[in-house]
Amino acid sequence: MSSGGLLLLLGLLTLWAELTPISSHDRPKFCNLAPESGRCRGHLRRIYYNLESNKCKVFFYGGCGGNANNFETRDECRQTCGGK
């Protein structure tokens, strides 16, 4: 397969993954955790998945500790946990 064909295939797979919703059975359990700012005193803008609203929302992270429901971008949150 040519490199152009591989790029097209990769693009189609990426699009399919973006458009396929994540069911609650496929969602990692840490997506259900409440956001935790952690024990440090930083003020980093981060994203967490909110189970009740099915949306990725902003919270402020202290910089250490916390839990895995903590993403740098909305896209990363959506790809991992689903949501809007």
Curated annotation (Swiss-Prot):
UniProt-annotated location(s): Secreted
Site (described: Reactive bond for trypsin): 41-42
UniProt xrefs under InterPro entries: Kunitz_BPTI, Kunitz_BPTI_sf, Prtase_inh_Kunz-CS, TFPI/VKTCI-like
UniProt keyword annotation of Disulfide bond present: yes
Disulfide bonds, paired cysteine numbers: 31-81, 40-64, 56-77
Domain BPTI/Kunitz inhibitor span(s) in chain numbering: 31-81
The UniProt record lists the keyword Signal: yes
Known tissue expression: Expressed by the venom gland.
Predominant location category: secreted
GO cellular component terms, semicolon-separated: extracellular region
Recorded GO MF terms: serine-type endopeptidase inhibitor activity
Family to which this protein belongs: Belongs to the venom Kunitz-type family.
Name the UniProt record assigns to this protein: Kunitz-type serine protease inhibitor B6
Organism: Daboia siamensis
